[in-house]
Every structure is written in C-alpha cells, then in structure tokens.
C-alpha cells in the first residue's frame, strides 16, 4: 500500500468514524473465537471449489450491505412482514446468502453467539479475494448486526449497473469514498458474473436510441448479442464480468476497459467518460497490478468501516436471516 494512501485511509477512519470505529480490532475474537478465520476459510475454500463465483457473491453482499446504513448485516435479513433489502432492485440476482448461512452454522457450532453476520461478510470477502489469487489484508472485527433493514436506502444508495459516472460519484462521496475508491472497488468486477438484464440495454437500444452503446467494442458487442439475443428469454443467462480471466482476481478488468470491453455501463463509464479523472486511474491499474492491489486493500478497509454498529448497539444474530 502506498504511504499516502495508507495515511489517507487512517485519517479517513479517524475523521469519519471516530469513537465507534475505535472499537473495531483485528484481535476482537482472539479469546472468544480464536479460530474464526480458519473456520470461515474452511467453508469458503469448500464453496469456492464447487462455485467459482463464491468470492464474488460474498464481496457484492459486503459492498451492498455497507452502502446502506453501514456494515451491519442488514442485507441478510429475510422479510418479517416488512420489505427487506433483499427485495430491492439493486439486489436482484444477489447470491451467496447460503454461503453466509453455512459459515454462520460452522461458527455457531464452535463459538455460539459470538461472531456477527456483519463481521462474517467482511472476513469472507477478504478470504474470497485471496482464494481467487488476489491480495490479503487485515480485517478488523467488532461489528454488531442490525435489528432492521432499509429497502428505500438500498434503492437510493447502491449504484445500479445503468448509472452514469456523474451519478455514481456522489453515491461514493456520500459514504466518504473518493474517486480512487470508486475505481479500485469497481475492480472487484475482475471476477464474478452478471445477468443479461444488467447490460443488455447496451446491446440494442442504449438510452432509447435504437442503437447499441457506441462505447462497446464491435467484436465484444457481437459476442454479447449472441449470449443475450434481443427478445430472447435471457432472465437466467449469465456471462463473465471479466472476459479474459473470469475467475482470477487480477488487473485484467482494467485492460478490458481500455479495449472497450467493460460489461456493465458502470464499468465502461470509468474509462469512456470524456475528461474524467477516473481514466488516469484505470490506466494506472491496467499498467500495475501491484498498484491496483494496494489501492484495493486500502479501499476495502475504508468500505468495511462505514458506520459500524459497535458496543451496546445492535446484536449478534444467531441466524443471519432473522433477528434474535
């Protein structure tokens, strides 16, 4: 991690989160559940062997969770008569809930009532990235789980795949994140897949023009049109977010953007928005995987520390799908 980015991350944590964040600690479970990391790694490793998308699913849940009322596990709640974040359009197609349940069961068998669901998302995200050949970082613990969900917040705060860069930037700055964070965290699209419905508007009728998105590479466009034919029954059809190394966590996502082969509109906007400062960041990451990894780690630490519930706030759910 570069020195300036490290200092920036520390100052951000102190300024934004203050006393509540000070209660997060890498040693939080050292006495109450000392094997938490090995237990979570065991489940993630098993699931990753049968589902290459496991890590991508978990990190999406973590990101979407933290962007709505902070990192509090609210995205995991099932309905209890009110609408949940799971029901929000931004979370359509979200997966990995069963993986979280498996991790929670494994932890409850060893350390009942100790490890929060919010902390599970943070730790499993790091492990998922490492298992996909990405960087490692020290995860801080001590988050509590929320008692409620916020569907309206999910609708307003989570970037949709159809956003322009002008819309995305304030969504990030409102969470204390800058342009580097936006581009670095978007790099998580170096693994995982997306449904046709999240990008097919770019293939045939972009913004109601009757034509494809002109920023899509012509050969890539033909490939995608074959995967998601116009008027086809594409609801359950997925394709890779990274066409070159779809299961590896690397910097190919950024070289794809340079070739106009970003899958989602929000991806390609980072490179194709004329005059944007994000272009230089994309070029930097395309040229240096080390730089991408360093900044990604810094941004993930910032993400994981957005408005956590700590101390006497919240609870430790024994079942991540429902409050105790």
Curated annotation (Swiss-Prot):
Glycans are attached at residues 35, 150, 207. CDD domains: secretory_peroxidase (cd00693). Heme b binds at residue 189. Pfam families: peroxidase. The keyword Secreted applies. Ca(2+) 1 binds at residues 65, 68, 70, 72, 74. Transmembrane segments: none annotated. The active site is at 64 (proton acceptor). It catalyses: 2 a phenolic donor + H2O2 = 2 a phenolic radical donor + 2 H2O. One of its GO terms (molecular function) is metal ion binding. The modification Pyrrolidone carboxylic acid is found at residue 23. It is an enzyme of class 1 (oxidoreductase). Disulfide bonds join 33-111, 66-71, 117-320, 196-228. Binds 2 calcium ions per subunit. Ca(2+) 2 binds at residues 190, 242, 245, 250. One of its GO terms (cellular component) is extracellular region. Its EC number is 1.11.1.7. One of its GO terms (biological process) is hydrogen peroxide catabolic process. Its cofactor is Ca(2+); heme b. PANTHER family: PEROXIDASE 58 (PTHR31388:SF147), PEROXIDASE 72-RELATED (PTHR31388). This is Lignin-forming anionic peroxidase. It comes from Nicotiana tabacum (Common tobacco). The lineage of its organism: Eukaryota, Viridiplantae, Streptophyta, Embryophyta, Tracheophyta.
């Amino acid at each position: 991690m570069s020195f300036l980015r490290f200092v920036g991350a520390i100052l951000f944590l102190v300024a934004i989160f203050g006393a509540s964040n000070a209660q997060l600690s890498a040693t939080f479970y050292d006495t109450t559940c000392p094997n938490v990391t090995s237990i979570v790694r065991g489940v993630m490793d098993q699931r990753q062997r049968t589902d290459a998308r496991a890590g991508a699913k978990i990190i999406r849940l973590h990101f979407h969770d933290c962007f709505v009322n902070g990192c509090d596990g609210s995205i995991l709640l099932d309905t209890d008569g009110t609408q949940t974040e799971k029901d929000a359009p931004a979370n359509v197609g979200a997966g990995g809930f069963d993986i979280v349940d498996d991790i929670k069961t494994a932890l409850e068998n060893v350390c009942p009532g100790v490890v929060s669901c919010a902390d599970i998302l943070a730790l499993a995200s790091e492990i998922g990235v490492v298992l996909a050949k990405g960087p490692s970082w020290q995860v801080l613990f001590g988050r509590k789980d929320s008692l409620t969900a916020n569907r309206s917040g999910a609708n307003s705060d989570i970037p949709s795949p159809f956003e322009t860069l002008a819309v995305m930037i304030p969504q990030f700055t409102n969470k204390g994140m800058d342009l580097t964070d936006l581009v670095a965290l978007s790099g998580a699209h170096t693994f995982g897949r997306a449904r046709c419905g999240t990008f097919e508007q770019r293939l045939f009728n972009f913004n109601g023009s009757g034509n494809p998105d002109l920023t899509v590479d012509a050969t890539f466009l033909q490939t995608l049109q074959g995967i998601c034919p116009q008027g086809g029954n594409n609801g359950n059809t997925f394709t890779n977010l990274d066409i070159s190394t779809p299961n590896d966590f690397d910097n190919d996502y950024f070289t794809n953007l340079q070739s106009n082969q970003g899958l989602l509109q929000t991806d390609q906007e980072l490179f194709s928005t004329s005059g944007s400062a994000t272009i230089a960041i994309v070029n930097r990451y395309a040229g240096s995987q080390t730089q991408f990894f360093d900044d990604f780690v810094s941004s993930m630490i910032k993400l994981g520390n957005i408005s956590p519930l700590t101390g006497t706030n919240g609870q430790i759910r024994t079942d991540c799908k429902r409050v105790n």
